[in-house]
Structure formats: C-alpha cells, structure tokens
Regions:
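Flexible "stalk/tail and boundary" regions
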Residues: 1-8, 12, 22-79, 83, ...
Length: 143
C-alpha cells in the first residue's frame, strides 16, 4: 500500500527517484499517466491492468467514458525502475503536470501521485480549507 508524502528532485534527464519503501511494490514495472488536478498518476502494472479492464468494460457510447478513457489510456506510458530506483517521466507528462525541478510523490493506497511542488502546496491549501465539507460529504457515503 502506498501512503505518505515525499519530496524529490527531477534530474536533468527527466528522472525521479522512487521512494525506497515503494520500490518493492513496483518490481513488475509501472504505468504513469495524466492524472486529475494536474498531477500524474503512477500505478503498479497489476493495478493499472485492473483500471484498464474496468475502463474497457464501460460503454463507449457515453461521452464521459470516452473522455476519461482518452485521458487515462492515451496519455499512459510503461515505466521501468532503473538500478538506482529512478523512473523516467516522459516530457509530455512533465509538461502536463508542470513538473520542473522539485517534485512531490504522494502515496494514495493503490497509486502514487506525482506533483510539481508548488502545485501540490496550492492544492493542499485549498483542500485543507474545505476539509470539514469534504469530511461531511464522505460521511454521507459511509466513510
């Protein structure tokens, strides 16, 4: 399970180090794709396959299905972790998430989110300001 928040730097070749405690969960490889809120989603391959299978089972006649499938699947790239525990983020994904130098890697149960540090801080401030409303809405869902 992925949890926690880690700060890393993007190197000149567009690589980031995966936090050590997460590397064992990514031994079979990973998939990175465009995420929501201008971040990147990084999934272990087995979790990615589950998501892709669910998307493939949805009706393509629905506009939201097509839009979400395009975002997630067309923007995706297979990744391998090198011997130093790094992954290469493709340039088009770095541009999408505005990732330049300082990167936040956030663990979210079955995936990692990769954020530009400034974007992460802005997002956190906005979310923390609404935390009571969010908690109430989740309570209505049984969380």
């Amino acid at each position: 399970m992925f949890i926690g928040e880690y700060q890393h730097n993007l190197d000149q070749k567009g690589r980031i180090a995966v936090p050590v405690k997460f590397r064992q969960l990514l031994t079979r490889g990973a998939v990175v794709t465009k995420g929501l809120d201008n971040c990147l989603f990084l999934y272990p391959k087995q979790e990615w396959q589950k998501l892709a299978d669910k998307l493939a089972a949805l009706p393509v006649s629905k506009a939201n299905t097509r839009a979400f499938s395009r975002l997630m699947l067309a923007g995706a790239m297979n990744l391998e972790i090198d011997k130093q525990g790094r992954v290469m983020l493709p340039e088009y994904l770095r541009k999408y998430a505005n990732v330049k130098k300082k990167v936040i890697i956030a663990g979210l149960y079955n995936r990692l989110e990769i954020w530009d540090e400034a974007g992460w801080e802005k997002y956190k401030k906005g979310t923390e300001a609404k935390s009571n409303d969010i908690a109430e809405a989740l309570g209505e869902l049984g969380v």
